[in-house]
Amino acid sequence: MLSLGLEDKVIVVTGGNRGIGAAIVKLLQEMGAKVAFTDLATDGGNTEALGVVANVTDLESMTAAAAEITDKLGPVYGVVANAGITKDNFFPKLTPADWDAVLNVNLKGVAYSIKPFIEGMYERKAGSIVAISSISGERGNVGQTNYSATKAGVIGMMKSLAREGARYGVRANAVAPGFIDTEMTLAIREDIREKITKEIPFRRFGKPEEIAWAVAFLLSPVASSYVTGEVLRVNGAHHT
């Protein structure tokens, strides 16, 4: 039987307690990976994966989490930088606190999620990093200047890491989801949700599991062994 080659690979997913992160954790477990996830709380219901309470905005917190994960599961092969937040408003109304919160989680948080693991990947000459960007990081979105800027930054970060890591056999890619059915998008007002749906050629929002499969592909040492520095769009042709 064909396999993505993720069996027994140790993979860390940040923001893995619910939503897209939880779907990624579940799928990777089903593929035989040894999965750990970090979040501000680990009570989302997945009792099989190793949950570690950690804050992606705090490098010391993530370094401590990395030590615990490595001690319990072994050397880490893959990191999925999924944790993210929004603080939406029109540009003139965005406060310094709105900017700082989103930059700290969505951009610095991605760097701090990767940093504790990457030197080990370089030493072992194997590893795959996948960061969750967004359709907003490529096309922008009204009321999301801060969010869009961070998600564009994530793409730039992965492209740079891909160039740095190539000589060590370490790949770095981004997944850019469109509108996905999560707690975040379910909070969108119904009339706005209907308007967005009509703009999507598939005429529906995506599912967290569809993002999880894209992540699994990019993590795979079999299916995507020569893929690095790329952005995989999963948006139902909303942005091509």
UniProtKB/Swiss-Prot annotation:
Alphabetical list of SUPFAM superfamilies matching this protein: NAD(P)-binding Rossmann-fold domains (SSF51735)
Broad EC category: oxidoreductase
Positions contributing to NADP(+) binding: R18, G19, I20, N82, A83, G84, I85, T86, P177, G178, F179, I180
Effect of gene knockout: Double deletion of phaA and phaB leads to loss of synthesis of PHB, no visible growth phenotype.
UniProt: substrate binding residues: S134, N141, V142, G143, Q144, G178, F179
GO MF entry, a single one: oxidoreductase activity, acting on the CH-OH group of donors, NAD or NADP as acceptor
Keyword annotations: NADP, Oxidoreductase, PHB biosynthesis
Matches recorded under PANTHER family: 3-OXOACYL-(ACYL-CARRIER-PROTEIN) REDUCTASE, 3-OXOACYL-[ACYL-CARRIER-PROTEIN] REDUCTASE FABG
Function: Catalyzes the reduction of acetoacetyl-CoA to (R)-3-hydroxybutyryl-CoA. When expressed in E.coli with Synechocystis PhaA, PhaC and PhaE confers the ability to synthesize up to 12% (w/w) poly(3-hydroxybutyrate) (PHB) depending on the carbon source.
The name this protein goes by in its record: Acetoacetyl-CoA reductase
Annotated organism of origin: Synechocystis sp. (strain ATCC 27184 / PCC 6803 / Kazusa)
